[in-house]
Curated annotation (Swiss-Prot):
This is Ribulose bisphosphate carboxylase large chain. Residues 1-2 form a propeptide. The gene is rbcL. It comes from Picea pungens (Colorado spruce). The record marks 334 as: Transition state stabilizer. GO terms for cellular component: chloroplast. The basic functional RuBisCO is composed of a large chain homodimer in a 'head-to-tail' conformation. In form I RuBisCO this homodimer is arranged in a barrel-like tetramer with the small subunits forming a tetrameric 'cap' on each end of the 'barrel'. Keywords: Acetylation, Calvin cycle, Carbon dioxide fixation, Chloroplast, Disulfide bond, Lyase, Magnesium, Metal-binding, Methylation, Monooxygenase, Oxidoreductase, Photorespiration, Photosynthesis, Plastid. GO terms for molecular function: magnesium ion binding; monooxygenase activity; ribulose-bisphosphate carboxylase activity. Substrate binds at residues 123, 173, 177, 295, 327, 379. It is an enzyme of class 4 (lyase). Belongs to the RuBisCO large chain family. Type I subfamily. It catalyses: 2 (2R)-3-phosphoglycerate + 2 H(+) = D-ribulose 1,5-bisphosphate + CO2 + H2O; D-ribulose 1,5-bisphosphate + O2 = 2-phosphoglycolate + (2R)-3-phosphoglycerate + 2 H(+). SUPFAM superfamilies: RuBisCo, C-terminal domain (SSF51649), RuBisCO, large subunit, small (N-terminal) domain (SSF54966).
Length: 475
């Protein structure tokens, strides 16, 4: 090395390890409208001060590394670094705190959830100085959200395509989820749609297995859709799962669905990946297909209260990546979901502007500007007795999906669909007449069952079925 080079490298540079808080903890920082803001629940190792742990999160998820490097002098760290700008305690948790981190917009590629998550929820989650780390919420500024297409169509366009207004949409997941032949599968689809459902659905793990290859399933389901439409005079759909082992195969399945003329396809966005999902969402908008999203694998990421990522962040990411429906819990069924928290991320999916509300877990005000909304899907362990609560909790802009609650009807699939449609229409009418579904819901169902034998039979079968476990996802 020449003396000249040694001099250059040594000016303003001292090798060694610095405390992160000297550079990345900046409580005086005033956040900008263009910053991406994150709220992390941090559990540091014993002896690590909160300021150092919060600064470490900001550093490792932006420009920092474990030691000082001389190439820091070749760029403007003040322009690009993440900043831990606030720290607050977590009530009832002495070893945890919330670290608020601001990221400058230039750190992220436009229109890429993949790049956003690679930084913010990347290697930092394995950092040894932290015992656990959870991303509770993100504020996505309009300057960044406008670089995304978002949902292929959105709520209003979907209603216009289906010509269905003033009520939640009704769906059913075909069961058993695995093992049926394509023809028997199509038969179940037809019976459910003929009975009054708007949609039927592939289960998340139905792709293209030996017992039912995807092309056969698509053809028989399309036949079922057209036959049910002709008999009922209503537009029908089946969520044809295009998820595949490669993006090329996924797109081939979506193209075939479009050629069949069906209205909607489906994707498992977490197991399939954000890059694949965004590609499919763009194809769906360009070709008039609705896109149903399943969240398989989400609980691996969001179930633990002190580590991982809250589903409200995954929901925001999906709205940017693209989807017209996404599963979001039921509050009353078999799957995890506390009411206020669930409705918090339901609003983040549907609404244009959502105010900060810590009681519902919403850490930041979120302005989606003109990005279309996503219909939340309530699915998992629900039946006709849940219909009043679901109608009251989720309102009209939702999809209520009954799998076992349709196909488990003692008289068969079509009567199961009839029971659900009658229960829904009765609840919507009662609500529109000013009745309180929270208090009078069971009576509304009993009254409707007097003139619907299908509903009466369903009420008898599921009158004792409850899923009463304490929710894990609490504030």
């Amino acid at each position: 090395m020449s003396p000249k080079t040694e001099t250059k490298a040594s000016v303003g540079f001292k090798a060694g390890v610095k405390d992160y808080r000297l550079t990345y903890y900046t409580p005086e920082y005033q956040t900008k409208d263009t910053d991406i803001l994150a709220a992390f629940r941090v559990t540091p190792q014993p002896g690590v001060p909160p300021e150092e742990a919060g600064a470490a999160v900001a550093a490792e998820s932006s420009t920092g590394t474990w030691t000082t490097v001389w190439t820091d002098g070749l760029t403007s760290l003040d322009r690009y670094k993440g900043r831990c700008y606030d720290i607050e305690p977590v009530a009832g948790e002495e070893t945890q705190f919330i670290a608020f981190v601001a990221y400058p917009l230039d750190l992220f590629e436009e229109g890429s959830v993949t790049n956003l998550f690679t930084s913010i929820v990347g290697n930092v989650f394995g950092f040894k100085a932290l015992r656990a780390l959870r991303l509770e919420d993100l504020r996505i500024p309009p300057a960044y959200s406008k670089t995304f297409q978002g949902p292929p169509h959105g709520i209003q366009v979907e209603r216009d395509k289906l010509n269905k207004y003033g009520r939640p949409l009704l769906g059913c997941t075909i069961k058993p989820k695995l093992g049926l032949s394509a023809k028997n599968y199509g038969r179940a689809v037809y019976e459910c749609l003929r009975g009054g459902l708007d949609f039927t659905k592939d289960d998340e793990n139905v792709n293209s297995q030996p017992f039912m290859r995807w092309r056969d399933r698509f053809v028989f389901c399309a036949e079922a859709i057209y036959k049910a439409q002709a008999e009922t005079g209503e537009i029908k759909g089946h969520y044809l799962n295009a998820t595949a082992g490669t993006c090329e195969e996924m797109m081939k399945r979506a193209v075939f669905a479009r050629e069949l003329g069906v209205p909607i396809v489906m994707h498992d966005y977490l197991t399939g990946g954000f890059t694949a999902n965004t590609s499919l969402a763009h194809y769906c908008r360009d070709n008039g297909l609705l896109l149903h999203i399943h969240r398989a694998m989400h609980a691996v990421i969001d179930r633990q209260k002190n580590h991982g990522m809250h589903f409200r962040v995954l929901a925001k990411a999906l709205r940017m990546s693209g989807g017209d429906h996404i599963h979001g819990g039921t509050v009353v069924g078999k799957l995890e979901g506390e009411r206020d928290i669930t409705l918090g991320f339901v609003d983040l999916l549907r609404d244009d502007f959502i105010e900060k509300d810590r009681s519902r877990g919403i850490y930041f005000t979120q302005d989606w500007v003109s990005m279309p909304g996503v219909l939340p899907v309530a699915s998992g362990g629900i039946h006709v007795w849940h219909m009043p609560a679901l109608t009251e909790i989720f309102g009209d802009d939702s999809v209520l999906q009954f799998g076992g609650g349709t196909l488990g009807h003692p008289w068969g699939n079509a009567p199961g669909a009839v029971a659900n449609r009658v229960a829904l229409e009765a609840c919507v009418q009662a609500r529109n007449e000013g009745r309180d579904l929270a208090r009078e819901g069971n009576e509304v169902i009993r009254e409707a069952s007097k003139w619907s034998p299908e509903l009466a039979a369903a009420c008898e079968v599921w009158k004792e079925i409850k899923f009463e476990f304490e929710a894990v996802d609490t504030i």
